[in-house]
Amino acid sequence: MTFSPNRRTILRGTLAATAGVLAGPVLLSGSASAYNWTRTMNEGATGADVTELQIRVAGWAADSASHSRVSIDGDFGPGTAAAVRRFQAAYGLSVDGSAGPATQAQLNALEQSDGSTAHFNWSEFYDRSSGNFNGGKVSAATVKENARRAMYKLEALRKKLGNVPITVNSGFRSIAHNAEIGGASDSMHLYGTAADLDVPGVANRTVYQKAETCGFSGLERYDVDHQHVDSRADLGRAWWWESGTI
């Protein structure tokens, strides 16, 4: 199902809960690295494996700028199928919207043995003060899962930008560290669902534009020294694209 509602600085947004993804309670899928897919999934399928599939294709939410996101609900609907097709096209796979062995193998190629993704590491998302995921607005386990979900969207963004390296300057922030730097009191960084990005050689405006297709519901304006992205709608918050649709 797709919902279509109407590394170093401060998130301005404010953040309420939506089905399947929560602000206070966990956003956990219970997955580990090298996910053990046991079946081909098609539209109409349900289950934990569908949830994991949705997490991994969430960055393929739209073809053009759109307040659309892949719902992480374990229900393989049209939005999930469309995201699978976009993923397949991007990686040179047969485009059929069916998550079979070839698609699953490519999805698993995007993960590392520790559960992070191919081009992003847990350390990039650690609180810059404590070096861990403790002290936020949710548990460390929830922060880690939120960061993992962000990584898969960032993998999609990286692919859409031509496989250029993306540096995460700021990921999760503890409440204490966020206060030290003057961050917003309910910053998405406190939940592990936000990242401030630096993409050398690529204009922030271009990063912003590509991020508009990746299911990011929070985008800070692009005319600053980084590009902020977050998934606040996954926590029930309203969409916020500071520079609008470009």
Segments (PLM) and residue ranges:
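N-terminal secretory signal peptides and thylakoid transit peptides that target proteins
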Residues: 1-21
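Catalytic cores and adjacent binding grooves of peptidoglycan-active enzymes
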Residues: 105, 184-246
